[in-house]
């Protein structure tokens, strides 16, 4: 369909849609899928509706098969393969909470393959991502990890807010090859809770503007919040 409609990936009392959007979450399982939400080679298009994705991991890691083969994760939100999430003029909100005591347990971990998360909303909160890794016993506990092929794009002057807390590793990691871009809206990246030898915010990719991606010029104010950075 090309009709504007909201897409909500969450969990809880289905009779209370408002709670699914604000406080509900899909829960990971301890036997077959430890991730709260797994995006595996999927395209989500809401054509002007909002997209909300909320996931909370299981308390122990599981091994499962994805488009890239067998993996062991217990993340709040985990993406595999080529992902497209496009809200049109709607807003995008992603919330991931990871709590496993073993394996890789990150708040939000995006894909190693080329992926785009896009909104043409002009609102200051066009795109929001919040990821928390809460268990120091996990092998990996990053707040938000982009990998090197994911782009977040506010194409119509909308704002972007990315907030990550990594109890063992860095709060927010935007590695080389990844990008957080807006044509004019504010970009705020906040990191906290990092472990020894890591950073609140770690950026080697592009923030604001990247050559070759169709955003034109950018007039975005960029704010980094944290007390230890790698830039």
Range-by-range predicted roles:
Residues 1-231:
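Surface-exposed loop/turn motifs in large extracellular/passenger domains
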């Amino acid at each position: 369909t090309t009709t504007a409609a909201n897409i909500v990936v969450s969990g809880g009392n289905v009779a209370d849609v408002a709670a699914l959007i604000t406080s509900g979450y899909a829960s990971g399982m301890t036997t077959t899928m430890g991730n709260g939400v797994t995006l595996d080679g999927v395209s989500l298009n809401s054509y002007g509706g909002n997209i909300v994705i909320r996931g909370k991991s299981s308390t122990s890691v599981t091994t499962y098969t994805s488009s890239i083969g067998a993996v062991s994760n217990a993340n709040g939100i985990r993406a595999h393969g080529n992902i497209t999430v496009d809200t049109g003029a709607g807003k995008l909100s992603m919330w991931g909470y990871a709590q496993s005591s073993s394996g890789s347990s990150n708040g939000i971990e995006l894909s190693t393959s080329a992926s785009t998360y896009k909104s043409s909303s002009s609102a200051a909160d066009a795109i929001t991502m919040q990821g928390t890794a809460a268990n120091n016993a996990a092998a990996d506990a990053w707040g938000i990890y982009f990998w090197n092929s994911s782009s977040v794009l506010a194409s119509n002057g909308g704002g972007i807010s990315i907030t990550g807390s990594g109890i063992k590793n860095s709060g927010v990691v935007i590695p080389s090859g990844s990008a957080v871009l807006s044509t004019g809206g504010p970009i705020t990246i906040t990191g906290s809770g990092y472990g020894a030898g890591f950073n609140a915010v770690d950026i080697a990719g592009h923030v604001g503007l990247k050559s070759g991606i169709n955003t034109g010029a950018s007039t975005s104010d960029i704010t980094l919040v944290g007390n230890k950075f790698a830039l």
